[in-house]
């Protein structure tokens, strides 16, 4: 901490404004906690649902079927109506002992000291760089999240005929986004012998006229300024070229836990998550974690109905499950602050 940094205090600080973070913040305010602050690094609150322009969201929370943006707007409004202070364009740079958070915002650097802190930073897809896919760095390469952000928030079309990599549930969300934007994928690739999702979800490829190539992986990306083609390899090692103008990497979710990894909190390298107890409490009892930043091991995770046990990918919860987890953890935090949590 430097002499120029301001020091502020609150009862509970929540890092992340997705379903888990906002659900927790709302319940804490409704439980009588006075100063609840949500810290969000982006310019809008609501998390991933903000750029998922399709249903179904909100059934568990509001008993209504909503699109992602409408759901995000509703959970933000619910939190604000409860009196939650949502601070945007605010990045936490360090998790300290004693409830100290180092923060940077357009107003400058400061230290926020909270009685309790909830980590609700969520999860992210694995990008091209982490998948070690060689080839051109041309324009037209992105993840589902980036695509949906461009289409639904910025009204931009990054490509017209991409190759889609992966067959997780989010991969088919990507297909829906492509259809809504007038994008026509030329193929969907899956390295395993079966899609990750169950029938009839993978039938979307047939209904949308997208060839589903199983036991096939991407081995190279070709192009100069823009993607022009990809080289793919099948189970026999045969390599061929597909003409396309983009590559869409989907799924392979990993917790957004970079803050935890470099902090004093105990970290599980197997799941890339903070270690928590049955109350969602971290190794430093000032800290809690909820939502997709806490990933169960594959042996402990329940297989969702839309996945096969054989091809179950990294466990990830939907918005409704994260909302529920946020509320449960918030109840534990409220009990902790009152001295009634074991």
Task: Give the residues covered by each predicted segment.
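Residues forming the flavin
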Residues: 2-342
């Amino acid at each position: 901490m430097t002499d120029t940094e301001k020091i502020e205090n609150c009862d509970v600080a929540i890092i992340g404004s997705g379903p888990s973070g906002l659900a927790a913040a709302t319940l804490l305010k409704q439980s009588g906690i006075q100063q609840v602050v949500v810290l969000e690094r982006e310019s809008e609150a609501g998390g991933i649902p903000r750029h998922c322009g399709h249903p179904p969201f909100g059934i568990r929370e509001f008993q209504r079927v909503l699109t992602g943006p409408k759901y995000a707007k509703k959970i933000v409004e619910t939190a604000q109506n409860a009196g939650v202070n949502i601070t945007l364009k605010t990045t936490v740079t360090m998790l300290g002992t004693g409830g100290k958070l180092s923060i940077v915002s357009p107003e400058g650097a400061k230290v926020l000291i909270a009685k309790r802190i909830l980590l609700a930073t969520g999860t992210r897809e694995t990008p091209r760089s982490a998948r070690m896919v060689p080839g051109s760095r041309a324009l037209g390469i992105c993840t589902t999240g980036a695509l949906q952000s461009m289409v639904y928030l910025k009204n931009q079309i990054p490509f017209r005929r991409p190759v889609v990599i992966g067959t997780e549930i989010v991969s088919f969300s990507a297909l829906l986004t492509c259809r809504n934007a007038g994008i026509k994928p030329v193929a969907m690739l899956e390295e395993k012998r079966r899609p990750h999702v169950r029938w009839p979800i993978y039938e979307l490829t047939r209904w949308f006229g997208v060839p589903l190539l199983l036991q096939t992986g991407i081995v190279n990306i070709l192009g100069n300024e823009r993607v022009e083609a990809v080289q793919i390899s099948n189970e026999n090692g045969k390599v061929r070229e597909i003409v396309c103008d983009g590559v869409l990497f989907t799924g392979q979710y990993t917790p957004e836990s970079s803050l935890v990894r470099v902090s004093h909190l105990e970290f599980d390298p197997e799941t890339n998550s903070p270690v928590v107890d049955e109350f969602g409490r971290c190794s430093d009892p000032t800290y809690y974690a909820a939502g997709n930043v806490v990933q169960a091991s594959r042996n402990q995770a329940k297989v969702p109905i839309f996945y096969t046990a054989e091809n179950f990918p990294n466990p990830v919860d939907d918005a409704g499950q994260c909302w529920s987890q946020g509320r449960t953890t918030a109840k534990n935090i409220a009990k902790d602050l009152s001295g009634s949590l074991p």
